[in-house]
């Protein structure tokens, strides 16, 4: 077999092998291996991290101090000064675990525990904060919505419990407001005060200080307290379903919003996502505090610690314009403007949520107070997501809690209030994986990069070999075969020559015949 043919056959075989293995088999092998690893089956590494996150999340709180409370009582816009951060470690775990292998599901209750943390710029919590009293404002706004005829009773109760206050504002330390509790004096004897206090004593989020007094805080009741029960798919049978919520609080869908679509649980609880999500799918996660699933959308690509990742961002949408979000409107005829959501139907309290500093919200909210400076870097929601394994490598989830201010002539301390939305505080839940957790990802991508480079080099080599073999083959085929000419001497065996040429026609015996 000629050399060019041998080269061509060898290169063709090599080309087929590299196409089959490098471009088809190896990617499928990696994909299959990753899918087999990303599940919540008992004993899996992912489940261990899902059940108890092996590191603390950075939890920061920023509070808004109202610097002109008495002016606000007269109708002026609130002037705000941001105070913070107040820093905490947040440890996440799941408790009371149970599994159903036939359904490929697991059950759990989430539990978040907060510990005070120190760090650059972190405040100790002793700072005094002036803000609208959440209970006074909350009680009045709730009664106005649900039982407006009882407003005079509430007015008397406020005077009784809070000692005839001259404003809706209170001043307390940051730690008392956030965790330790602001005391509510419920040892009153009048009918209105006792009626309201009897309701407050049944509220699960208020701490009983003693027989009469209660204490209110924003985050204290949730600290180290198991939440309601989840039922999620483990992803053993189908990796694309890993972590997907099937039930929450023993319900297959919510009973909060007016449409079936908005009452659906979409996505996971935010601590695990399926591998190989497409950009178009987004990152869907259910937030129990909002009674809503939020979907972070793809917005670009970048690198984190050398790992290629996607950038996802999220907002609260615009219920006033988006048809799919009309279900979140407080009433069919009343929708909040862009970037704002009312939690009254969800939590039973008139609290509005937005992004910090009203970022990505209607401009009227920003102009309704003084002192805000919304910007993407500090106030947006951003997730850096590694799509192969389905893991966030860096994230900043931010949310601001607000309460509406509305004038009400039936209550003296509400009579001249401005009509605006007042920010109370905002939180940031952050995570950034260190080298301990990114190294396995970097090793995986290093192997994939080496294989990618090698397969292209081998393929180019094979194509080059085929080209060289073809050149050699056709070059040989075009050459002419020339036979060399040798001088012939006369024979010495009696053969005659005529005219100097050898006569091959007659031998000596033939001549003798004549």
UniProtKB/Swiss-Prot annotation:
**Gene Ontology MF terms in the entry:** scavenger receptor activity
Signal peptide location: none
Residue ranges of the TM segments = 7-27, 453-473
The yes or no answer to whether the keyword Cell membrane is present is yes
Q: Which Pfam families match?
A: CD36
Q: Which residues lie on this side of the membrane: Extracellular?
A: 28-452
Localization annotation: Cell membrane
Which intervals lie on the Cytoplasmic side per UniProt?
1-6, 474-514
Q: How does it sit in the membrane?
A: Multi-pass membrane protein
List GO BP terms, alphabetically.
sensory perception of smell
Any one cellular-component term (Gene Ontology): membrane
Disulfide bonds listed in the record:
262-327, 291-346, 329-335
Glycosylation sites noted in the Swiss-Prot or TrEMBL record: 65, 434
Q: Chief subcellular site?
A: membrane
InterPro entries in alphabetical order:
CD36_fam
Q: Which UniProt keywords apply?
A: Cell membrane, Disulfide bond, Glycoprotein, Membrane, Olfaction, Receptor, Sensory transduction, Transmembrane, Transmembrane helix
Top-level lineage group: Eukaryota
The function of this protein is: Plays an olfactory role that is not restricted to pheromone sensitivity.
The entry assigns this protein to a family as follows: Belongs to the CD36 family.
Q: Which protein, by its recorded name, is this?
A: Sensory neuron membrane protein 1
